[in-house]
Design a protein with these regions (language model features):
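S-adenosylmethionine/decaboxylated-SAM
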Residues: 21-257
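Class I SAM-dependent methyltransferase Rossmann-like catalytic core
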Residues: 2-31
Length: 257
């Protein structure tokens, strides 16, 4: 699909790479996902791919973004207007929980914002909902503690390099070459040495362990607290706790976190 529609060339700095999106969508199809909740659409590159996927498969797409940059948000909404996507404006700590109240759809949760441990905690909390089948997060870079923590939650590889174990099918190879050319042409900040999107199949892992994951890095918003707030409708409390924690303790460090 990405090659057919020439979507590789539309990639912009900071977005999920084409092969990373292809890997995510393939895992969703294998798991029988019928709804994808995306948090963090930025300029809408990955959301556009999700929209094309929805057109072809009928999978429901919910895309959440804070939209603090109104001009950027307007451009993004205009580009995505032709796609069957529910565009939600709001805080992920509230809106992911609201989207998960639809219990009759096998769901994947993809987080590209917020970042860091807040995102990991949101994903782990999502696993407490039985309809959630796939958890995925972007910006899991080499050397980051979040990368290792997320990978350790799974009983199988979460990054495509190890999951595919050297697989080089025709379409995958052509997509990789198109991506390499793109990286060189645009002078991308990162290369293809290591993918930064992890994809975890909850059915092949320990759901209870994921939902109850614990770490001091979660600060005042661990997965169990988030899951409780979502199930009891205390969405605003989560937003308050996350914002207050960042005010009192400072925002999470990004590099090496």
């Amino acid at each position: 699909m990405l090659l057919e529609l020439k979507l590789v060339d539309e990639w912009g700095e900071g977005a999920i790479f084409p092969r990373e999106m292809a890997f995510f969508l393939t895992r969703c199809q294998t798991a029988g996902v019928t709804q994808i909740i995306e948090s963090g659409r930025q300029d809408g590159y990955s959301t556009r791919i999700l929209g094309e996927f929805a057109k072809r498969t009928g999978v429901a797409i919910v895309s959440i973004d804070y939209e603090d940059d109104k001009e950027r948000a307007e451009r993004c909404r205009k580009m995505l207007g032709a796609f069957p996507i529910e565009l939600v404006t709001g805080d992920a700590f509230e809106e992911i929980g609201r989207a998960l109240q639809v219990h009759d759809k096998k769901t994947a949760v993809l987080i590209d914002g917020p970042k860091n441990w807040g995102a990991v905690s949101l994903l782990c909390a999502s696993a407490s909902f039985p309809q959630v089948a796939i958890l995925s997060m972007h910006n899991l870079e080499e050397g980051y503690l979040t990368r290792h923590f997320f990978a350790d939650l799974s009983s199988e590889p979460v990054f495509y390099e190890k999951y595919l174990d050297g697989y080089q099918g025709d379409a995958w190879g052509r997509l990789g070459e198109a991506e390499r050319v793109l990286i060189d042409r645009k002078g991308a900040a990162r290369g293809q040495n290591s993918s930064t999107i992890g994809v975890l199949d909850v059915a092949n892992s320990d759901r209870i362990r994921i939902a109850g994951a614990a770490s001091s890095h979660f600060r005042s918003y661990p997965p169990k607290f988030i899951g409780w707030a979502w199930r009891t409708g205390n969405y605003g409390l989560l937003k308050f706790v996350f914002s207050a924690t960042n005010r009192w303790l400072g925002a999470e460090r990004y590099r090496g976190c």
